[in-house]
From Swiss-Prot:
It comes from Nitrosomonas eutropha (strain DSM 101675 / C91 / Nm57). Pfam families: Hexapep_2, THDPS_N_2. This is 2,3,4,5-tetrahydropyridine-2,6-dicarboxylate N-succinyltransferase. It catalyses: (S)-2,3,4,5-tetrahydrodipicolinate + succinyl-CoA + H2O = (S)-2-succinylamino-6-oxoheptanedioate + CoA. Homotrimer. The keyword Transit peptide does not apply. It is an enzyme of class 2 (transferase). Belongs to the transferase hexapeptide repeat family. Its main location: cytoplasm. Keywords: Acyltransferase, Amino-acid biosynthesis, Cytoplasm, Diaminopimelate biosynthesis, Lysine biosynthesis, Repeat, Transferase. GO terms for cellular component: cytoplasm. InterPro entries: DapD_Trfase_Hexpep_rpt_fam, Hexapep, Hexapep_transf_CS, THP_succinylTrfase_dom1, THP_succinylTrfase_N_sf, Trimer_LpxA-like_sf.
Length: 273
């Protein structure tokens, strides 16, 4: 793995010179190896180690290099034709491959090669970009988007129209992460490397980026970039210092433990807030 990383790191420093016409065979093979490992889940862009998320920047660099190395080409599809650099994850899948994968794909869902889809995942007509990781038992509902390198945990529900942001550039940024057992309400957007802690519920129409104020109603604390585990979050606003206007924020209205979360329906958690 260290040798693979060294090849990628070296090539990335001279990425502006790389074209589909001059790419070295060794680099092309190395990048293809990384993409294949991402595709099968043997390698992840980010992983939780000792309760902290660690991002492998060199893996993101390999994904970016893949765009430099390939020309767009004609891609046949069941409903249309396409013109892109990256093939569909399922371009060469047989019926047996789908059965072995253990997930459902409802047309016209689209998944790029280099994204991992785990057992018991359901993909409604949705989009999953390269480098993403969608773990077991997750539902990606209609018109939801899982962006490049985003990490989605086990038993997550991404409701209709949800956007989970991708972060390939700037390359030093961490990916957006939705931890296990989270519910993300319809049309909500979680972007820019925000982390949503496990067992959290995000209500419909909540938008959270790195500059979004996250207000804890119980403590009065304002934080950025991370939703604590077990949070129930709705959209709200906070007044300006001069009292003349209010600006958008996300409000943590309550926090529940995993036991309460498992026994309580989503609507019950959001009522009476």
């Amino acid at each position: 793995m260290e040798q693979l990383q060294a090849v990628i790191e070296d090539a990335f420093e001279r990425r502006a010179e790389i074209t589909p016409r001059n790419v070295e065979a060794n680099l092309k093979e190395s990048v293809a190896q990384v993409i294949n490992m991402l595709d099968t889940g043997k390698l992840r862009v980010a992983e939780k180690i000792n309760d902290e998320w660690v991002t492998r920047q060199w893996v993101k660099k390999a994904v970016l290099l893949s765009f430099r190395m390939e020309d767009n080409y004609f891609i046949k599809g069941g409903f249309s034709n396409y013109f892109d650099k990256i093939p569909s994850k399922f371009a060469d899948y047989s019926s047996r491959d789908f059965r072995d994968g253990g997930f459902r794909v409802v047309p016209p869902a689209a998944v790029r090669k280099g994204a991992f889809i785990a057992n018991n995942v359901v993909l409604m007509p949705s989009y999953v970009n390269i480098g993403a990781y969608v773990d077991e038992g997750t539902m990606v509902d209609t018109w939801a988007t899982v962006g490049s390198c985003a990490q989605v945990g086990k038993n997550v529900h991404l409701s209709g129209g949800v956007g989970i942001g991708g972060v390939l550039e700037p390359v030093q940024a961490s990916p957006t992460i939705i931890e296990d057992n989270c519910f993300i309400g319809a049309r909500s957007e979680i972007v820019e490397g925000v982390i949503v802690g496990e067992n959290s519920v995000i209500s419909m129409g909540v938008y959270i980026g790195q500059s979004t104020r996250i207000y804890n109603r119980e403590t009065g604390e304002v934080t950025y970039g991370r939703i604590p585990s077990g949070s129930v979050v709705v959209s709200g606003s906070l007044p300006a210092d001069n009292g003349r206007y209010s600006l958008y924020c996300a409000v943590i209205v309550k926090q529940v433990d995993a036991k309460t979360r498992s026994k309580t329906g989503i609507n019950e958690l959001l009522r009476g807030i």
